[in-house]
């Protein structure tokens, strides 16, 4: 074995060890966080906690209204944000060319980097102030605005992965461009688009700042979209900054529920990404 081979083996061993160390540190930190949340929250977690509404300071009460409110907000934001994001992504991939397409792409990239609290303030100015009250609708719009650029960019990238031979074959058969896009390209990219949608939902499910300016929060179960609505993130925030130990314990339990929700969404994403073109 000459010196060159020895140097290569040493370099390979060093890089392999460094990669393994980084992996252990990243996974270890995640496991520590998850374990600590589970340890702190499991004591207050029970069935009544999941279905009851909050009570004044003391024993009892739950996060049933916050769970339902979070689901309403996620559903509302998905109804608004997912179709819009997919349409923007299809435009950028299949149609958008020239300066206008570049401008749309620039706007989408800019929206991706805007802090969520800025989005909340924007929706507060255009919806909450004219309506003169907080509402679930405003919260859903704020989350949808955060969701759109994520879905748009993911959709664009997934559509670009579709082989050009599929497009060319459909066009050669005489199909118009719009039918090729709807009937060939989008179905081929559907697993990737669904993955992007789930990632966007997971992303907005942990948002707090925009909801403080829009949905605000409530101690009651939601009945309409035109009233303030509770959410897990806002309730965790309110309980965490309170001076009461009982609310601190419930904040940990609510965090465990939220973490389980996000992990469940990520598992679904992993299952969807197993499919390939």
Regions found by a protein language model. Give the residues of each.
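Interhelical loop and adjacent transmembrane-helix boundary motif
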Residues: 54-57, 61, 211-259
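Transmembrane alpha-helices
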Residues: 155, 177-214
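C-terminal transmembrane helix and the adjacent membrane-cytosol boundary/short C-terminal tail
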Residues: 14, 156-160, 171, 195-198, ...
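Hydrophobic positions within alpha-helical transmembrane segments of bacterial inner-membrane proteins
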Residues: 28, 70, 74, 78-90, ...
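Periplasmic/extracellular loop-to-transmembrane helix junction in inner-membrane transport proteins
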Residues: 2-21, 36-79, 97, 235-249
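Amphipathic cytosolic juxtamembrane alpha-helices at the membrane-cytosol interface
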Residues: 84, 88, 92, 97-101, ...
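Cytoplasmic-entry segments and transmembrane alpha-helices of multi-pass inner-membrane transporters
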Residues: 17, 84-123, 150-157
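Generic hydrophobic transmembrane alpha-helix motif, especially the helices
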Residues: 109-145
